[in-house]
């Protein structure tokens, strides 16, 4: 049983593309000292 319901919708389930994929490299723009950020996981996306 899933934690979140479908909201009563029926029909085809559309695939929502991710904003940032796993493995994306981003430039950091704050003063932490890091220059590049590497995405190692995307939270909340369940798939096969």
Curated annotation (Swiss-Prot):
Q: Name one GO molecular function term.
A: structural constituent of ribosome
- Which keywords fit this entry according to its UniProt record? Ribonucleoprotein, Ribosomal protein
Question: What InterPro entries does its record include?
Answer: Ribosomal_uL14, Ribosomal_uL14_sf
One GO cellular component term noted in the UniProt record for this chain: cytosolic large ribosomal subunit
Q: Name one GO biological process term.
A: translation
Family affiliation:
Belongs to the universal ribosomal protein uL14 family.
PANTHER family, alphabetized: 50S/60S RIBOSOMAL PROTEIN L14/L23 (PTHR11761), LARGE RIBOSOMAL SUBUNIT PROTEIN UL14 (PTHR11761:SF8)
Q: What is this protein called?
A: Large ribosomal subunit protein uL14
């Amino acid at each position: 049983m899933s934690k979140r319901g479908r909201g009563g919708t029926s029909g085809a389930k559309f695939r929502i593309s991710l904003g940032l994929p796993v493995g994306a490299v981003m430039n950091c723009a704050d003063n932490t000292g890091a220059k590049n950020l590497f995405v190692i996981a995307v939270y909340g996306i369940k798939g096969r």
